[in-house]
Amino acid sequence: GNAIPTGTVIVLENIYYDFGKWNIRAGAARELDALSALMKKYPSMEIELSSHTDSRGSDEFNKELSVKRADAAHRYLVARGVDSKRIKPLGMGEALIRNKCKDGVECSEEEHQYNRRTEIKIIRIDEPVSIKYEDKGPEVIDRKKD
């Protein structure tokens, strides 16, 4: 078969969402397309998709929204031929805000956008690769006020 060159570096990016929504944006689709190709190339690879919201809205609403976001990313990969069992979707709600923008803190749309993400983590891979997690941040800031 094709031996994977040792030291292949897999770079994984976070994907981002619009406010209150869970649809897969264009930038996210590009990342997930690349991820599905990687998962086909490395058959042992299993991933965790942990989805997060910004702090606006109730904890319950955000928990549900994050589950929908994780599921949307999961479904997207499965639609591209990845076995569902290799993907573990997790909805984290607003539990892991990455900046100061917790409940009641005034923040810009940019700052809120940074929190609306799914983080992709490799939880298993048998092939000899190194993994790099990068975050260029969202390519689009959703400024729509619902």
Locate each region found by the language model.
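Periplasmic OmpA-like peptidoglycan-binding domain that tethers envelope proteins to the cell wall
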Residues: 50-146
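Periplasmic peptidoglycan-binding/tethering modules of Gram-negative envelope proteins
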Residues: 1-46, 122-146
